[in-house]
Amino acid sequence: MKLSLLTVAAAAGAAVAAPAAEIDTRAGSVQGFDISGYQPNVDFRAAYNGGARFVMIKATEGTTFKSSTFNSQYTGATNNKFIRGGYHFAHPDTSATAQCDYFLANGGGWSNDGITLPGMIDLEGTSGKPKCYGLSASAMIAWIKAFSDRYNAKTGRYPMIYTSPDWWQSCTGNTKTFGTTIPLVLARWASSPGTPPGGWPYHTFWQNADTYRFGGDSEIFNGGMDQLQRFAKGG
């Protein structure tokens, strides 16, 4: 989740209570990974046999881009017993609700089948856009809230937020607005997750490296397999 596909293409051409599954006492961990169109041919069987149990797959970006590999990746993950979900690369300089609706229409939904993760908003900078997409901290917070509330209204779950401590500090002023309602996917490529930003008491997932042996980025769930299954089911 380092560069958007749109960025690369452009460069080449020129409040509700936290769900019950959000458990405060974490035990163990589960390996997973995230992928996008840069990894079109993942060997999901090998990844599962290698110990991975969940995967996050890029579905959409903005309101015009849908990953051409999403459907095959999602099917491959499903057929190989993964808990899986879609993520949306956010462009907070355009409508939050329009982006949420586009995400939901193109793979970002959630159901309580026990194998579907709630959708994830990928919040990070990208080339060709000003810092924080030109938004003030208050405007960025309002954008995230509008997207999250829309997702919750449509699915009954809040989406996850993927972000780094630096981005969160710079673009939201380290707001604590979402710390008790929205699961955190912490981007920190280090030997330990450290202290979560904002008001989060803990991370739910940790992107601990920008490489993974079966493709994409390494992700670790902050809990055991039973907790991951309950989290996916939403209760």
Curated annotation (Swiss-Prot):
Q: Which residues form a coiled coil?
A: none
Query: Which cystines does this chain contain?
Result: 132-171
Provide the protein's localization: Secreted
**InterPro entries in alphabetical order:** Glyco_hydro_25, Glyco_hydro_fam25_subgr, Glycoside_hydrolase_SF
Q: Name one GO molecular function term.
A: lysozyme activity
User: Could you say which protein family the record assigns here?
Assistant: Belongs to the glycosyl hydrolase 25 family.
A GO cellular-component term linked to this record: extracellular region
Residues of the signal peptide: 1-17
The membrane-spanning stretches of this chain are: none
Q: Which residues form the Ch-type lysozyme domain?
A: 29-235
Taxonomic source organism: Arthroderma benhamiae (strain ATCC MYA-4681 / CBS 112371) (Trichophyton mentagrophytes)
Going by the UniProt record, its keywords in alphabetical order are:
Antimicrobial, Bacteriolytic enzyme, Disulfide bond, Glycosidase, Hydrolase, Secreted, Signal
- Reactions accelerated catalytically: Hydrolysis of (1->4)-beta-linkages between N-acetylmuramic acid and N-acetyl-D-glucosamine residues in a peptidoglycan and between N-acetyl-D-glucosamine residues in chitodextrins
Name the catalytic site residues.
34, 122, 124
Annotated Pfam families = Glyco_hydro_25
Entry's EC annotation? 3.2.1.17
Q: What function does the entry list?
A: This enzyme has both lysozyme (acetylmuramidase) and diacetylmuramidase activities.
| Gene3D superfamilies for the chain | Glycosidases
Q: Which GO terms describe its biological process?
A: carbohydrate catabolic process; cell wall macromolecule catabolic process; defense response to bacterium; killing of cells of another organism; peptidoglycan catabolic process
Name listed for the protein in its UniProt record = N,O-diacetylmuramidase
